Amino acid sequence: MGSDETKSTLDTERSTVPRTGTTTKSCSITQVVLRFVLFAATLTSIVVMVTSKQTKNIFIPGTPIRIPAAKFTNSPALIYFVVALSVACFYSIVSTFVTVSAFKKHSCSAILLLNLAIMDAVMVGIVASATGAGGGVAYLGLKGNKEVRWGKICNIYDKFCRHVGGAIAVSLFASVILLLLSIISVLSLYKKIR
């Protein structure tokens, strides 16, 4: 009779304890998918920015004048943008493999989750600052600055400005993905140590 009570007590405890395996698995699938989307977004933004070169000829009566080409290497802020997104792209590859291998082993340590949470937060800062720097240059190119007599260039280099704007928009999307990853990493760490 004592064994029947023990069985019913164990069955009751099993039914009241939440299953953490399903939440961990869904969390890992979400992380892997978001890290892959992050890779695609950062790579797309890099490619769009690097291919943003445009040259123009201005025709003055009598002779055409070739003005300098507009390319991302003309601005230190856009160079920083490309480098920062390259770092984030590389990080997304490494973190995807680490996440997949950790969850395949079914042993995701608290140290690994802490490292992912810290690195995700660092990457949010890097990508957000690069997006802001690139956005500032793009805004100056679009509107100019009358106070210091910087003319707008997007009326001349329209294709270049569209590329820069597209790269910055995709980078902003990557920043949001990184923010979501950072939140998920912290929640996973919280569930692990709780």
From Swiss-Prot:
Signal peptide limits: none
One Pfam family matching this protein: CASP_dom
Topology within the bilayer: Multi-pass membrane protein
Entry keyword Secreted: no
Transmembrane stretches, start-end: 32-52, 78-98, 110-130, 164-184
Compartments (UniProt record): Cell membrane
Ranges where the record places region Disordered: 1-23
Cytoplasmic side: 1-31, 99-109, 185-194
Topological region Extracellular: 53-77, 131-163
Source organism superkingdom: Eukaryota
Keyword Metal-binding included in the entry's annotation: no
Basic and acidic residues: bias regions: 1-16
Similarity remark: Belongs to the Casparian strip membrane proteins (CASP) family.
Oligomeric form and interacting partners: Homodimer and heterodimers.
Name under which the protein is recorded: CASP-like protein 1D1
